[in-house]
Amino acid sequence: MQHETWLLLFKSLNSGKFPGYVRFKTQAARIHDTTLAERLGFDKDEALSLGKAVAGLNAQSKGRRLGIFKPVPQEVKKARARKRGEEFLIEICGRQVPAINTTDGVRAVNKNQPIEAKSVERYLESKFGETLGSARAAMRDLAKAFRPEQLLKNAFSLYEEFRPAIPEGVKGWGAKGNLDIDRIRSLALEK
């Protein structure tokens, strides 16, 4: 099994004063900056696929912590991992994401199926509408303010600088937050 280290600052767009509300983590986390992924070597479609996988993994972890989801027994996890043919792991923000090379490039895997970029893109467009472009542009500016190795080291702390305030615990599960594009841009300027 090959292991590659890679970072997606997918969570970074989930914050502040965004005109369209988005659900914390699962929706906004998917709207990661594809230019960051390209800067680190992955193309836009690869980044969309991997970002969706990480958002799902993080949502599952939070759900387990809150008692909403029950953990899967270790034996089942191992069995599922063995069924996946030529997969490898990609580390994204400290998470091990199963991935596979397809004819279209690297794709994250969910339930033994590659996550297709087009479906993730449609989802993001449906949630963010015409503001998707400006959110990506702000993240592009933020990503350009750092060298890739700095992003690998500081991705989550950057996210913490502008993540939305939502209720803790079960009350915050699925809560909506705002995206403050100006705050994201200011972080790039502060750098």
Question: Where in the sequence are the language-model features?
Answer:
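Solvent-exposed interaction surfaces and binding hotspots enriched for charged
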Residues: Q2-K191
